A protein has these predicted regions:
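Structural micro-motif
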Residues: 75-87
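Local sequence-structure signature of Cys/Sec-based thiol-disulfide redox active-site neighborhoods
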Residues: 21-57
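Non-catalytic, surface beta->alpha helical segment in thiol-disulfide oxidoreductase systems
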Residues: 85-122
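N-terminal leader/targeting and pre-domain segments
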Residues: 17-32, 109-122
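Sec-dependent N-terminal signal peptides
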Residues: 4-12
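Extracytoplasmic/secreted cell-surface and envelope-processing proteins
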Residues: 45-48, 72, 93-95
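N-terminal post-signal-peptidase region of extra-cytosolic proteins
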Residues: 65-70
Length: 122
């Protein structure tokens, strides 16, 4: 019993024990301001957005929602792929796939949301 208490105490005081892994990545990714994150899953790799790296004036990342079971709930991901545009870590735009899990939003539409964020600072 004493060992169980020690083990539980260790788990409770371990830093970032309950912090989702993506939170650390998001902090680093969005450090420069605007970042675009595609949430997808391996089972839907055929519908992955391929133009994400073509976006300008932002950082980009693709995250597998199966890697962290809390991601769909934390980010309200109901269909994949879902693209979030984040400014300083906060969601400012969301683009979701249709019922066939195909992204209908275009690169130009996502880029426009990025450009609007930049223009709003002037």
């Amino acid at each position: 019993m004493k060992y169980l208490v020690v083990l539980l105490s260790f788990l409770l005081v371990t830093p970032n024990a309950s912090k989702p892994l993506f939170e650390e990545e998001k902090t680093e990714l969005c450090n420069d301001g605007i970042c675009v994150v595609q949430f997808n899953a391996k089972f839907n790799a055929a519908n992955e957005v391929t133009w994400l790296d073509d976006l300008t004036d932002c950082s980009t990342a693709t995250v597998d929602i199966m890697a962290d079971p809390s991601l769909p709930q934390d980010y309200k991901i109901v269909v994949v792929p879902t693209i979030l545009v984040l400014e300083d870590g906060e969601e400012v735009a969301r683009f979701q796939a249709n019922i066939m899990m195909t992204m209908e939003a275009t690169r130009d539409e996502v880029q426009e949301s990025i450009d609007n964020i930049i223009m709003s600072k002037f």
